[in-house]
Amino acid sequence: MLRVENILDAARTRLALVNQESPVYEAAEILVDPDRPLVVVCDGEGVVVGVISRTDIVKLLACAKSDALSACADAIMTRSILSCRAHQPLQEVWEAMNARSLRCAPVLDESGRPQGIVHARDLASALLEEVTHEELLLRDYVMGIGYQ
């Protein structure tokens, strides 16, 4: 059974952090990068307190406040987040993300510190690869290959 730890290297490459006191424009600058779909917001101790997505930035800009981008990150971040741990099965994370229509989620360690960001495409790819491998093993078993 595949677990989040199996795709953690890819998740680490897209991890982007800001402090909850950082201005929103810092998160916006990060989100310009197509490989950074989410910015994790941390407190002074490095513990996750929320996330900022491109949608959060668009909602802020829709308010058309002139000082919107200088607001603190914690003013616009999403506080109720779906996160996962490295030991969790990929299928479980996939189902939770689909239930909430999410494309990505932060991976946290046991103390709530961010380790990476898993993306739905990574989960789908790993799960498909696992199923394909199982099908090949089953086919070989049925055909008697390697069991003679």
What is the predicted function of each stretch?
Residues 1-148:
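Tandem CBS (Cystathionine beta-synthase) repeat/Bateman regulatory domains
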